[in-house]
Amino acid sequence: MAKVTVKLFANLREQAGKTNIEIDGNDLREVLNSLIEKYNGLGELIFNNEEFHPFIHVLVNGISVKDKDGLDTMLSTGDEIALFPPVSGG
């Protein structure tokens, strides 16, 4: 099982109360399921049913999971997952 770091930004960070979380998992789905079990309320911010919310960006080692295998993206120890919710500004 891989030990990875999940980096949370904006309202995801506020909901969890942490910026960086170390968690174990073999693929992205497993890591995110563990994350939302530990931190109440994150699931609604990340997922719409069983898919990512349309505007959330998920990167593994700086590469969008849309360019990989989505939730089935395999992970290795030391990988970094970044979760970016929609952000607006002016």
Segment roles from a protein language model:
Residues 1-89:
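Ubiquitin-like/PB1-type beta-grasp interaction modules and other compact soluble beta-rich domains
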